[in-house]
Each structure stands twice: as structure tokens, then as C-alpha cells.
Amino acid sequence: MEGSNCSLRVNRQLLDPKFESYKLSLDPLPCYNVELDAAVAEVCLRDDQYTLDHMRAFGMYNYLHCNPWIPNSVFYVDQLERVMSFTVTLDTAMGKPIEVFRFPRDLNTCDSRLCSSMYFASAQWVTLSDGTGTLYIIRIGNQSGSVSGKWEIMFNQELGEPFIVVHSVSSVRDELHIIDVLLLSIEKDESDIKGSGFHVCLEWVSIARAQNEDNGKYEILKRRKLFGKSVPHYAAIEPLGNGVMMISYKPFRFIANDKDQPESSEDEKMDEDNKREPLYNWHQTGEDVTLTFQLPEGMTKEDLTIKFLPGEIDISLKDQGTFLKGQLYLDIDCESSAWIIKEGRSVEVTLTKREPGSTWAELVIGDKHGEYIVDPTQTAAIAEQLMHLTSEDMNPNPETEKPPCNAQELEECDLFLEDSTSLCRFDGARLKATHVVNLGSNPYLFTFVATPELMPCFALRHDVDALLWQPVSEQADNLWDHIATFNALGYVQASKQDKKFFTCAPNFSYSALCECVRRIFIYRQPTPVSTELYNRKEGRRVGQVAKQQVASLETTDPIVGFQASNERLFVLTTKKLSVIKVNSTD
């Protein structure tokens, strides 16, 4: 993949190597339930949506949305095709969800409908998808953030196949008010014969209007597409719309200008260069290495200079300079090494190995201009030596004899297969990856918004902890800041096999995860204790304790939405919205 390889810089001051564990607390958690007038518009997967990517994108979708500019405010779409808003003003007097917008068309007539989705690009702008392929840009009339503010359609257009809104931002650039939105869809791929038959499309749409034209019309300014083979864990647009950041299991590539062919990249050009004829060929036996190349036309033996050193070789041609020079893979016997010119102007250089029986992985370290010719007899000998390690038949019962491990003792973290997961930053102008971070040893955990004006944060597992990272596009030398740590949370979440949603408070005071049905687990940051505790094993006083709490809903309906504020958790089922009071208002 293109782009410079980077690494995430962990802030050691945010780590607690002395953290022991979470202590189960039986302190009650007040829970308030609000009955919904109409059920949530949950869209089940169809028979043709059978892949893991369909399940990740649509089957595990979070139907509860938050407005990060308005604390304790959540939104959802019900079966009457209404966008409903719910804001907590007083815990003891919960109101009812209020309709703020209604889709102008019947959504149930679309056979390929997806779930409706939304994202708040700013405090006054919302991007909304009806799940049938139409994108809406909504302006909230009341800038105070009241739920009674008027939602006004400023743009709506059918863009093609159904999609969901992943992220959006609002910015002013070049005297234009631009709303950038990221849309996700899964499309059939007829060329993918061996795979799932689908590919993932992330479309980056820019919609603009002149800033000084209050009554002007919003129009599509630009459309760009990213194609990949896996649903990204994280995807977001930079605040000024200069680039996109993404975490995905498999790489993505840009499709520019709505064409079906990607722009040629430097890597592809390099691949073409690598397909040119090699300058030389070489092969080896147990005793020596033989290098062969053609002498250019018009040159004689006197125009060729070959120097042998124990660990180096230098081949040069008159008037053309160095042909091959560098450090050999292993040392040679200079006195026994020689070269000759054979018929057809072929030069054959024989290098005698100082260590007979050794195998060279390359001729000159780092040189890519030659081609290694495999000796068939050597290949057969190696295959025969490895015969006892291979078989043409699958082992029907691998646990009957010398099992490599006890499968019952493995955790999810031990079975993590996405070793090629990467964090990438794509430049919006060049349509190329500029930064790449390999996350093979740091599994993705969850995404949330800590600061509304910035990009969403993401949490990764580092050893046993969960580390929170804030993308900062303005810092060219360090695009991701480590801003908080949840001790041992990476280890804890790996044990929750039934977990569905994962989030944390914007002020990092607690994290929470919910199962598919009923149970919610809350993990608080360490806080000072009112009474003195003493650790007898280590002989020291304990000044702070990290608490774990468990809440259980009264309903057995599946949980379809989950959001957190600094004071409350919002849990949505198909028929009820539950509000759990976690912290007192500061």
C-alpha cells in the first residue's frame, strides 16, 4: 500500500502499570424507561445479505444516534418513518420522544432498503439517509439546540444504490459552504469469483453552496469512491475535508472521477518496472553460486572487470560504469571463484561458497535486478525432506493425537485473525494514502466522539489496556494523539462473547458495553476512596479503586441502540428507551 509507514506514540504518563482489577460494586444505578409510540424501524438482513461484511455493516447497526453538540440528546427513526428526538432535562420527569422530521416518501416500497442513518455534521447541519439511496442535508433552524428546532431540507437527491451515512463534516472553504459526507454500501462484484462476490464501497460526496447565498441551492461538488474487500471498523473525514482516515482489515483504493478504473499509482508503476527483463540470472548448488548475464554488443573480454572479495563482488563495464556491486549474502572463496565468456556472449561467474551446504536467499543483499533460477533437483530434495510435515489429506480429528493447545483455554484475543488491519490516511487531492499504521497487534475496539469539532476518536487494544486515540489532522508529524486509557479494558472486553455495542463517556470517566439482550457492564476510572484500604499481599495502602457495575434491563427485547453521555447511558430496544444514570451532574 502507498504511504509512509507510521506508528502510534503511546503516552506513558497515561498508563498505570500497577493497576490490579475492577472491583464489583453493588451501588444501585437508577434506570428510567420510556415507552415508544412506534417501534424502531429495524431492518433485518435479507437472504442475499449473507456475508460477514453485511452483518458488520447492517446487522450490528446502532440505531440510536447522538448529537455531540447537545449533551443527553439522542435520535432514532421509527416505523412511521419519523426521526424522533429525545432529550433529558430532568431525571424524575422524563418526557416523550418528539418528532423532528418525517421522510417525504414511503420507504417500505423499496425491496433493497437498508436501515435509515444519520450523522450531525455540525450543531446546525445533519446528513440523513432514508436507506433507499436518497441523501438528505438538513438544517436545524433553532441554533440553541432545542429539540423543537425546525428541520429544513436543504438538499435531497437519489445517489444510486442504498447506503448508510458513516460520517460527515461541515466547513467553509474558498467562499463555499461545503458538507462532506461519507457513505457506505456493499455492492455485488461479478469479477470476484473466488471471494464473497461483493465489495465494499465508501463514497465521499462533497455538497456545496456559495457562502453568501443564503437562498442558493446546494449542489454536488465532487464524488469520489473508495473500494475495498472489508467493512472498515472506522472511517471519518478530516474537519476541513482535506482527507479521510480509515481502519480496515483489507486495503482500500480510490476510484476517481466516477470511473471504473483506478488512477495508476506510483506502486503500480513500480510493479511495471519490476516486470522488465532481469539484468542477470543466478542459481546455486551446495558448493557454489553461478551468475549469468549477457555482454552488451560491441564489448570484449577486455571491457569487462570483475573483482572478488570475501564478502563482496564488483562487476563493471567499460564506458557504462558499475553493472553489479555490493555485499554478498555469504562469504566466498576468492581463489576458487572464476568467470568465463561462453558462446553467445554469455558471461558466467562462478562463486565458490566458503560454507558448503549453505543456502543463499539472495545474491547481493538488497539488489532486485536479478532473477533466481530454481534447480529442480534441489526443489525435489527439499520437498522430500519436508514430506513428513505435509499431507494431501485433511486431518479429520486433530485432537486425537498431540493437540497443539487446549481450544477451551483460548480467548477471543488469542483467535484474532485480522493481523493485517491497518490505519490509513488518504489525501483528498491526490487520492492516495499518505500515512499507514499497521495495527496487527492492536485490535480495534470502538469509536466515539469526544470533541464535536474534531474527528471521532477510536479505541485500540494495547496489551491488556484500551487506549483512546484522537486524530489530529493539523499535526503532520503525529496525526494521532493518545488522550486516555482504560486499564485492563482490552482484556475485559475479550471475555464478553455476547457483547454488541461498546462506548465510553466523552470525559472518559467510564466505559460501557452491552450484550445483545438485557445486560450492560460499566467500568469506571479509578477514583479515591473515602476510607483507607490496605493490601495485605503487597503490604501497601490503596488510595483509589476502579469499580465495575452491572445493569440489567427489565425487557428481553434485543438491544438495537447504545449511546453514552458524561452522566447517562441510553439503551434502545425496539419498543423502549432506557436511561441509566451513571454519574451525577458536575
Curated annotation (Swiss-Prot):
GO cellular component, as recorded: cytoplasm; nucleus
Record-linked Gene3D superfamilies: 2.60.40.790
Database matches in Pfam families: CS (PF04969)
Organism domain of life: Eukaryota
Descriptive protein name: NudC domain-containing protein 1
Alphabetical UniProt keywords: Cytoplasm, Nucleus
PROSITE patterns to which the protein is assigned, alphabetical: CS
InterPro entries in alphabetical order: CS_dom (IPR007052), HSP20-like_chaperone (IPR008978), NUDCD1 (IPR037895)
Chief location bin: cytoplasm
Region (Disordered): 259-278
Domain CS: 275-364
Compartment annotation: Cytoplasm; Nucleus
